[in-house]
Amino acid sequence: GFHMTIDDWNEGIEGELDDMFAAGITSFKMYLTYPAMMIGDGAVYSALKALKKRGGIAGVHCENAGVIDARIAELKAAGRAADVSAHPEARPDYLEAEAVARLLRIAEAADAPVVIVHLTNREALDEVAFARARGQRVYVETCPQYLALDDGVYYDANWSMAARYVCAPPIRAEENQRALWRGLR
C-alpha cells in the first residue's frame, strides 16, 4: 500500500486527507526527527485525531531530533564526522525510547491507534508494553537488520564495509536484538 508523509499540519492539509482517503490512502507516516520532514508534538496530536476520525492510522519514526542534532555537532567538533562508529553514539537507544514514550502519550491523549516504525531496542519495546497495558492500540514494525545484526558492524576496520550499515535508528547491541525476537513471539 501507499503511505503518504505528513510533514506539516494545518487546516488545508487536514482537508486534503479526505482526497487521500477517497483515493484509498489511509495510512500515513510522520517523523519526530529529520528537520525537513518532522512535525511537532501538537501537529502529531492533531494529525492522529484527524486520522482516527476517518479510520486511518499513522506510522511514526521515533527519535529525539534535538538531542541527536546536538550530539552530532559534538562528534563533528571532536573530529569524528567520518567515523562510522560515531553513528550509534549520536543516536543512542534511550533517545529512541524517549521519543517512543512521548509519541505513545500523544497517541493516548488523541485516543488514536499508532504504528511505531523501525523499533530497535528493549527500552522502546518496554514503552510499548506499558502503553498496551494502559489499553492503547499500538502496532510495532521492526526491520531485518535489527533482528539479524548487532552494533559490531559499525566497528569494522574497513570503513566502506562499516558504512554500509548506517541506518536510522542505528543497529543496536545484541541484547536489544534478543528483546526484539522475544517481542515477536
Predicted feature descriptions by range:
Residues 1-2:
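A glycine-rich helix N-cap at a beta->alpha junction
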